[in-house]
């Protein structure tokens, strides 16, 4: 399994509003295009963390679907709740992905 962690800033709105955006989207086509098998959303203060598990590295697949109507719709809806962690360096979704520097998995 491959993982990705997307990090951003979260507004002071209910986290359930963000969860609702993904709950409405997850039955659709987009998760299949990206290969998402699991999604978890976390909040720590004003930090939003979006953990994705996928069969293959999701980063390149996300980059390929940024123009897909479902991706555009989700992005538009999330603008009210989520903003780039560092707006000065954000250019694409890839800029919001954390870099894994340690991973352990049991045998």
Swiss-Prot record:
Keyword Glycosyltransferase included in the entry's annotation: no
Pathway: Antibiotic biosynthesis; curamycin biosynthesis
Sequence intervals crossing the membrane: none
GO biological process: antibiotic biosynthetic process; polyketide biosynthetic process
Keywords: Antibiotic biosynthesis
Superkingdom, taxonomy of origin: Bacteria
UniProt-listed InterPro entries: Dimeric_a/b-barrel, Polyketide_synth_cyclase, Polyketide_synth_cyclase_sf
Pfam family, one: Cyclase_polyket
Keyword Transmembrane helix: no
Name of the protein in question: Polyketide synthase CurG
């Amino acid at each position: 399994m491959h993982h990705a962690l997307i990090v951003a800033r979260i507004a002071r709105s209910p986290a359930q509003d963000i969860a609702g955006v993904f709950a409405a989207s997850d039955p659709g086509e987009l998760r299949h295009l990206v290969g998402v098998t699991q999604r978890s959303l976390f909040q720590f203060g004003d930090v939003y963390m979006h953990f994705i598990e996928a069969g293959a590295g999701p980063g390149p697949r996300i980059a390929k679907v940024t123009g897909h109507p479902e991706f555009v719709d989700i992005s538009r809806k999330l603008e009210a709740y989520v903003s780039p962690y560092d707006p000065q360096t954000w250019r694409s979704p890839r800029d919001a992905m954390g870099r894994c520097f340690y991973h352990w998995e049991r045998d």
